[in-house]
Swiss-Prot record:
Protein name: Cell division cycle protein 23 homolog
Alphabetical keyword list: Cell cycle, Cell division, Developmental protein, Meiosis, Mitosis, Neurotransmitter transport, Repeat, TPR repeat, Transport, Ubl conjugation pathway
Protein family: Belongs to the APC8/CDC23 family.
TPR repeat placement: 86-120, 159-195, 232-267, 332-365, 400-433, 434-467, 469-501, 502-535, 539-572, 577-610
Annotated region (Disordered), positions in chain: 628-673
InterPro entries: APC8, TPR-like_helical_dom_sf, TPR_rpt
Phenotype upon changing residue 161 to K: In ax68; results in sterility
GO molecular function: molecular adaptor activity
Quaternary state and interactors: The APC/C complex is probably composed of at least 12 subunits: apc-2, apc-10, apc-11, cdc-26, emb-1, emb-27, emb-30, mat-1, mat-2, mat-3, such-1 and gfi-3.
Transmembrane segments: none
Function: Probable component of the anaphase promoting complex/cyclosome (APC/C), a cell cycle-regulated E3 ubiquitin ligase that controls progression through mitosis and the G1 phase of the cell cycle. The APC/C complex acts by mediating ubiquitination and subsequent degradation of target proteins. Developmental role in early embryogenesis and the metaphase to anaphase transition in oocyte and spermatocyte meiosis and mitosis in germ cells. Required for embryonic anterior-posterior axis formation.
Inactivation phenotype: Developmental defects in the gonad, germline, male tail and hermaphrodite vulva. Increased number of germ cells arrested at the metaphase stage of mitosis during the larval stage L4; by adulthood, there are no nuclei in the distal part of the gonad and as a result, no sperm or oocytes are formed. RNAi-mediated knockdown results in defective metaphase to anaphase transition (Mat phenotype) and embryos that arrest at the one-cell stage that display defects in the formation of the anterior-posterior axis.
């Protein structure tokens, strides 16, 4: 039977046991979550399971000197243009270079080629005659004073005094190409900062411009009038792409960032911005592999971010590990990304292990560390979480990651009021993060404040409709409130965002079963198992569904596969005990005494089932003894007639004893079938 893995559920004429067994075989080929390194799972298998197709071509080892040259160029560009985040990102990679790439001749390679020149911008579109430092026909400020003013403006940018910096750069912009760019960038940063400050208290509350146009719109029009998109400095087009994002012109912004990457593939901020806008994974892969893009390694890292954004975390891990295989070993950036993807896949042990490796190399690094607190919270490791919260609170008290970690610490102690307080503080520091609203919603649910939880989840959906967690939170809330029709809608929306998440399919199946839509529920539970049952609930829910509607044969089939998969999992002991008891009694009822004896034997391995197992053995022995006497009773002869009366009397005497044993066994355990 051929099975399509591009959709979570399907109709099939084959038996349900065959479908489940095929799912077990398919899932059995997968390694444990987060353990792809050294496994036999091919990129094609991962692609088939995820429903998307990208190129996983084996690429050659990264050339160390070329890698360093790219980063040195980017470091100089981001430093001179005051892109502080990109500068720190670049310097972190350079600081963790593999030892073999740190030879003196390698590190000095680029510095021997050129020194930093303020107006130098490498671009294939630049003309040799266009590198004049001064704009034609403009008055020139004395060189010394201009240099001092430029340096002062750059200091103001680093101090986040953007309007003040723009004021001073306006004096020097006509005599210096770099200051020309920085002036427009400072205006953008000033408007962006004011926008965030206005929206800090209420995300998505739009500022009203009743009498004047948006400052972003005015700045964009000014740059269009000056034809800065065609400027030899490619960074102008990148800046216009950022303006287009703020104006809601997402298609134009995507086109701008694509052009920037084609013109200068070493500008990582353009790759990063494009990863947040590109429409789908296949389109991103086609762009990266096109002949126009000449990238040594940034294209692969870009694909890792795109795959993570579209919730293809297994494939993102593989892409990241490809970079490690190609030589980028020991980089906290890559290890942290693998940890973040493991967290999203609910492989929290792997995530914790990876984060701990990063903290050994860089103890004060906060990037994505809130996800470590999330994994510790889910693992209920209060000791490690409290230690982490104390350490980061001492050093980085006013970072949003710290606020999330401290909030999770209060949450694990069931102090929801303090948890909400710190989550709200994190929102003020990073107002555009939908995940924070989701976490606040969870805490309101703990406090049984459904109205506030509903508002929080809806805020998360407004900020990022593609994030399944806001939809899933609303579905859970309505499910708890016994409103399954509402819950169904939000679970369906969540499943659209992340169609291969087994948790969402199990939740959908539960709602369908509550609405008596049995076939839909069965498809969801089966589909959840097909896509790798993360929490181990799909087969169990499928078996209980059939048991609830008295379809014991199908329930037994599901319980059998459940035991094959989970019998050795200690955390599922209660479910294992129930499944064994059900199967032992089921096969006894249908008189399959061989299988009944097999499961009765398994009953003896559990203290709570010993008496049930012994009772079944006695019942089976009596039935088999009775059946063995039947041929003797039916044989012709005078002795049989005389023995019939005596045998009948013996059966009459034994009957109360059997009934007594049944009465004794009744109530010996908590299982009822």
């Amino acid at each position: 039977m051929n099975v399509s893995f591009s959709t979570p559920v399907q109709n099939s004429t084959a038996s349900r046991l065959a479908l489940i067994q095929q799912a077990a075989a398919r899932s059995g080929a997968l390694p444990p979550a987060g353990q792809y390194r050294g496994s036999k799972l091919s990129p094609f298998d991962v692609s088939q399971m995820s429903g998307v197709s990208i190129s996983m071509v084996e690429r050659a080892k990264i050339n160390g000197p070329e890698f360093v040259e790219e980063l040195e160029w980017l470091r100089q560009q981001t430093t001179s243009r005051c892109f502080l985040d990109a500068e720190m990102w670049t310097n972190e990679i350079l600081a963790h270079l593999p030892d073999k790439w740190c030879a003196p001749n390698t590190l000095n390679l680029y510095n021997q080629v050129s020194e930093l020149v303020l107006d130098n911008t490498r671009s294939p579109m630049a003309s040799p005659a266009s590198n004049s430092l001064y704009a034609p026909g403009e008055d020139q400020m004395p060189t010394v004073k201009r240099n001092h003013t430029s340096r002062f403006a750059q200091s103001l940018i680093k101090n986040k005094e953007f309007r003040r910096a723009a004021f001073f750069l306006e004096k020097t912009m006509n005599g210096n190409k770099l200051d020309h760019f920085l002036h427009f960038r400072c205006l953008f940063l000033a408007y962006y900062q004011e926008h965030l400050e206005n929206d800090a208290e209420g995300i998505e509350r739009k500022t009203s411009f009743a009498e004047e146009r948006s400052p972003f719109s005015l700045l964009y029009q000014r740059m269009e009038d000056k034809k800065l998109r065609e400027n030899e400095d490619v960074w102008f087009e990148y800046l216009m792409g950022l303006l287009e994002v703020e104006l809601g012109l997402k298609d134009l912004a995507e086109k701008s960032f694509r052009n920037v990457v084609i013109r200068e593939p070493r500008i990582w901020p353009a790759w990063e911005a494009l990863s947040r806008l590109i429409a789908d994974i296949e389109d991103a892969d086609k762009f990266v592999t096109s002949a126009e893009v000449k990238s040594l390694w940034m294209g692969d890292w870009f694909m890792t971010l795109v795959l993570q954004r579209f919730h293809q975390h297994s494939m993102a891990i593989q892409k990241a590990e490809q970079l490690v295989t190609r030589g980028m070993t020991g980089l906290p950036m890559i290890i942290t990304k693998i940890a973040a993807c493991s967290n999203a896949r609910h492989d929290h042990d792997q995530a914790i292990s990876n984060f701990e490796d990063v903290r050994k190399a860089d103890p004060y690094r906060l990037g994505d560390l809130h996800l470590l607190s999330d994994s510790l919270y889910i693992r209920n490791d209060q000791k490690k979480l409290s230690t982490l919260a104390i350490e980061v609170y001492k050093v980085h008290k006013f970072r949003w990651e710290t606020c999330c970690i401290v909030a999770n610490y209060h949450a694990i102690r069931r102090d929801s009021e303090h948890a909400i307080k710190f989550f709200q503080r994190a929102l003020r520091l990073n107002p555009g993060l939908a995940a924070l609203w989701v976490l606040i919603g969870h805490e309101f649910m703990e406090m049984k404040n459904n109205a506030a939880a509903c508002v929080s989840y809806r805020r998360a959906i407004e900020i990022d409709p593609a994030d399944h967690r806001g939809w899933y939170g609303l579905g859970q809330m309505y499910d708890i409130m016994k409103m399954p029709a509402y819950a169904l809608f939000y679970y369906q929306e969540a499943q659209k965002c992340k169609p291969h998440d087994s948790r969402l399919l199990v939740a959908l199946g539960d709602i369908y079963s509550k609405l008596n839509r049995i076939e839909d529920a069965e498809k969801c539970f089966t589909g959840a198992y097909l896509f790798g049952d993360v929490e181990g609930n799909a087969l169990w829910s499928l078996a209980k569904l059939h048991e609830r509607y008295s379809d014991d044969n199908k329930a037994a089939q599901a319980f059998e596969v459940f035991l094959v998969v989970y019998e050795l999992v200690t955390s599922a002991e209660e479910k294992i005990i129930y499944a064994i008891a059900f199967l032992a009694n089921h096969f006894f009822k249908i008189e399959d005494f061989d299988k009944a004896s097999e499961y009765a034997t398994k009953c003896l391995a559990f203290e709570t089932l010993c008496q049930e197992g012994n009772r079944l053995f006695r019942e089976i022995a009596k039935i088999q003894a009775r059946e063995s006497r039947l041929p003797v009773e039916e044989a012709p002869g005078p002795s049989n007639a005389s023995a019939a009366g005596g045998q009948e009397a013996m059966d009459t005497e034994e009957a109360p004893q059997e009934g007594g044993e049944e009465e004794m066994s009744e109530g010996e355990d908590d299982f009822s079938f």
